[in-house]
């Protein structure tokens, strides 16, 4: 396993978060000075207050790790950036350390691909957790029983009118947003990750509000797919250039049907189950809980904090954090803090994925199997104190982290945010989470309120759903404006050197002749110190990622490979099977309390499931037809390349990229070297496509070294995923034997 060399701990800048609005700032929150947690300040924590913008130099630490899977802790070589600050000053509360500091800027790495759980999976986890606590006799959150006051007839009529009013408003706004996004897709524009998530939720809402749309929209879409491909050729990449018109038609039909089936399955997983016995208590409990935290100042119970903290998932939290909060988290995790908001979120997302995978691997081996240096590396990667503490303290805080993340299922983003606030160590984990939730924006609370209703199977409040949709749409529009401003600034920088403006002269004045500057030899100062310059890496832009995608598509066409389509179809079948198994497990869990008859799948979900199963059969037929035609020789030959061979040489990849569009030779060479991880001169096309799809979802520019890290990470993720699948298979076999 690769050893880890943390060359220096100097200058790890603690984070600065903005104070939360409209409520009192608790101790340890970003509004107040934070206590240092470095080793040299262990005895000064109660008497020296230092703001977040500085830190104390500490001794370098050299760490190593054992086992191949811990290699994801390996950090890339640092480049120190000097940030000029004001000198040390004294204030009424003590000394404020504001001086020059060295900020280590590192590249990021990621771990196993974490797919978001569907609403059904979240409901299943919630049910299993409740039943497990009931069996073990542990604490289960149970809201106090309240006397239900029967509403008057007029109040019930008014509430029903409001419900339908907000429902029709939601239907109209969802239709407008869906039509706009669909038009963008038809015209060849790609949706960002945030836009795709919004589009997915809107489609799920439309089918929930009007279940009959499944009979109208889905068959209509399938029928018009060939027409849409003809009218809007930009829907698919322009790489379907084959010698056989039949092959071109079949492959286009296969690609579009596969994407549509995957989208419909994602829509099914976004739909919630219906619980007829639900009384809307979960939504009300969450509103009361958040009101206690934000307004009244009343402390919720530990069960409430742990229960509702699970709703603030990493994606939801990171997408709605402000820029100062994103910068603070990047500094805490020693990531690059300069760049667009999308780039910062992308870095944080990849780092959180890495931490999630590491947590599972550490828990499998056991914290006691790690030595001191490995413990320091693990704690430092999670924003916890790593120096100046005992070995028992390191093991204790790492065990507490694993318990909160893996057993209590607290999202990693909340745990990292609590470390960024540098709260006192005497606070309990529940109090730390409470202080962290106070700093989250209001939009996160709206999204979580809708999520808790979906997980519990309650009727979603149309007003809350409407507010969450409008806030998310406003955030998407703000991202578009930021991208437009960034493009304009880049264009302005390109034209700036060409502008030469002459200095104006006063009328009637004669130009003065230029006099040579004479400087005495004794006054000339020479700096003999060598100039230190960081290594400049080749940056890959979004446009070049698209070029690389086109090149891969051409190579796949030349090799007549359907490996990608087959793999995606198998994943789709697994998703359908997992969804069906989750429904069966939910009924099994509910049978323990006799409530299985009250929970059922929505009508739209049932109809979409049948349609997806039909489309899977059609896709299987298309793939079989293409393979039979290739074997019979009816389609074009594979240009001398063996069919199904997906490994190409680096030279082939460079030539393919040259044919698509001109890119500098140096960048092509460095990019190809980054993709060739084991340096054998060969690259797997399918693995390359996975990397491109991962980066293409985000509108960010990355370096070639970061591309290499993604390639290595994806291979590591596959190994971890295989271990988990093998473990699940073994558990199922044991359960079948017992039954």
UniProtKB/Swiss-Prot annotation:
Q: Where's it mainly located?
A: mitochondrion
Q: What is the effect of changing residue 305 to L?
A: No effect on mitochondrial potassium ion transmembrane transport; it fully rescues defective proton/potassium exchange in letm1-deficient yeast
Write out the ranges of the annotated region (Disordered).
718-739
Q: Which UniProt keywords apply?
A: Acetylation, Antiport, Calcium, Calcium transport, Coiled coil, Disease variant, Ion transport, Membrane, Metal-binding, Mitochondrion, Mitochondrion inner membrane, Neurodegeneration, Phosphoprotein, Potassium, Potassium transport, Transit peptide, Transmembrane, Transmembrane helix, Transport
InterPro entries tied to this protein: EF-hand-dom_pair, EF_Hand_1_Ca_BS, EF_hand_dom, LETM1-like_RBD, LETM1/MDM38-like
SS bonds (residue pairs): none
The residues that hold Ca(2+) are: 676, 678, 680, 682, 687
Question: Which residue ranges are assigned to the Mitochondrial matrix compartment in the record's topology?
Answer: 230-739
Query: What outcome is documented for mutating residue 358 to N in this protein?
Result: In CONDMIM; homozygous patient cells show abnormal mitochondrial morphology and altered levels of components of the oxidative phosphorylation machinery; loss of function in mitochondrial potassium ion transmembrane transport; does not rescue defective proton/potassium exchange in letm1-deficient yeast
Signal peptide (residue range): none
* Superkingdom, natural source: Eukaryota
Its recorded name reads Mitochondrial proton/calcium exchanger protein
As recorded in Swiss-Prot or TrEMBL, the protein's gene is named: LETM1
